[in-house]
């Protein structure tokens, strides 16, 4: 309801919304009343023209989605059970301050959506989350990434400063350079994996045996002790396989240097990157663009493809950032977007991935954000508009207006002034 109104700049009739959303007018009117009374993010305006949403200052659909994640009983229920496996149903109802019958109805309804969309459910005897383990972990990577800011660390039993130190030292072992965003993502993935592993839930994936052995042999005693004290688990091969999954897959290269070396020695990597390079060069050629950091972009895209279902930023729970990013690119640079969309769909077939909108948008975001100097090039390639300024006061007034316009629009316009008395064409 809210997303439909947000994506439409015009007034929408209630009957039109009812048809689009497959929902009765009566229910929509009830929702409208509740939303306008209970939320301060927006006002849903009503008139004889229909309905229209008006967001309040510093509010948006994104802030609305974030508020839902914070306040929704359904998401609170999932989080409580994830962090407290085997909790009794009565304890959950007490924490949510709802009756047992209401809780059971909520779980029954929620399980239908969870099974259909994520291939797992909530079991109530006692409470636990069961199903496809990889999908369970990926869901909660994405959930905690979208719901909590870095400073709002939700895992109370794992000290954030200790977690930062552990992640920092693990990175140092592999000599991996990292930024704030990547560091935060690794923290979330590791802690989600810890909660599942602690409760005897395992994933079975290929791993880089050499890397596992390196970590076992090169982790010093002080760090090993800190890990075992923090997680209350023995630091051994199983711990590494379950906690550091997916970063120890054999297809993952932790530095661009490792990746470039693999192109020279690994036939499969060489073949894949050749196809990727061709796609990127085709996009650049079609749009009259240079691609100065092609090797870096190949490395990032290759990594994104293999880590896609382990990277929380590749999907979403409520707010689809990649979709809105791609939509904005389509609006601002339609020719580039068409090339990217076609190219990224082809890119997904190289990795045997489904050509989904979510996956394609994730690849588009990755390319646009990592392509060096892309936005300046696109603006330079735009046709410039010729502007002639004529003043009916004096020539210096025309020069002043030229300076004002140049300040606001920069190189987008070619501006001239004239003092001629003949303005006929």
What are these language model-derived features?
Residues 1-425:
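A cross-family "folded-core" feature that marks the main globular domain of proteins
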């Amino acid at each position: 309801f809210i997303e439909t109104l947000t994506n439409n700049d015009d007034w929408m009739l209630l009957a039109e919304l009812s048809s689009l959303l497959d929902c009765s007018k009566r229910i929509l009117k009830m929702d409208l009343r509740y939303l306008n009374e209970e939320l301060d993010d927006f006002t849903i305006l009503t008139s004889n023209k229909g309905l229209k949403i008006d967001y309040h200052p510093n509010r948006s659909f994104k802030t609305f989605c974030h508020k839902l994640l914070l306040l929704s009983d359904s998401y609170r229920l999932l989080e409580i059970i994830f962090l407290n496996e085997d909790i009794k149903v009565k304890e959950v109802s007490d924490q949510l301050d709802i009756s047992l019958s209401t809780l059971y109805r909520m779980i029954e309804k929620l399980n239908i959506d969870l099974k259909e969309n994520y291939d797992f459910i909530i079991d109530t005897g006692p409470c636990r989350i069961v199903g496809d383990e990889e999908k369970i972990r990926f869901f909660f990577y994405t959930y905690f990434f979208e719901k909590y800011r870095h400073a709002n660390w939700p895992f109370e039993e794992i000290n954030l400063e200790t977690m930062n130190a552990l992640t920092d030292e693990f990175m140092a072992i592999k000599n991996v350079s990292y930024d704030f965003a990547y560091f935060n993502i690794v923290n979330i993935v590791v802690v989600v994996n810890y909660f599942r592993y602690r409760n005897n839930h395992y994933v079975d994936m290929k791993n880089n045996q050499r890397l596992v052995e390196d970590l076992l042999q090169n982790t010093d005693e002080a760090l090993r002790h800190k890990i075992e004290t923090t997680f209350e688990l023995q630091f051994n091969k199983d711990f590494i396989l379950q906690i550091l999954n997916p970063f120890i897959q054999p297809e993952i290269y932790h530095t661009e240097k490792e990746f470039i070396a693999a192109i020279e020695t690994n036939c499969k990597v060489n073949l894949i990157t050749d196809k990727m390079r061709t796609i990127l060069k085709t996009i650049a050629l079609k749009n009259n663009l240079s691609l100065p950091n092609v090797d870096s972009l190949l490395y990032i895209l290759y990594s994104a493809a293999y880590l896609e279902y382990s990277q929380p930023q590749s999907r979403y729970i409520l707010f689809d950032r990649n979709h809105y990013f791609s939509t904005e690119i389509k609006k601002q640079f339609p020719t580039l977007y068409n090339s990217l969309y076609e190219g990224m769909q082809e890119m997904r077939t190289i990795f045997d991935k489904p050509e989904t909108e979510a996956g394609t948008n994730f690849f588009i975001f990755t390319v646009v954000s990592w392509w060096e100097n892309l936005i300046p090039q696109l603006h330079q390639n735009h046709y410039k508009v010729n502007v002639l300024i004529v003043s009916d006061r004096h020539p210096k007034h025309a020069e002043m207006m030229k300076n004002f316009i140049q300040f606001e629009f920069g190189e987008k316009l070619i501006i001239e002034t004239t003092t001629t008395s003949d303005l006929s064409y």
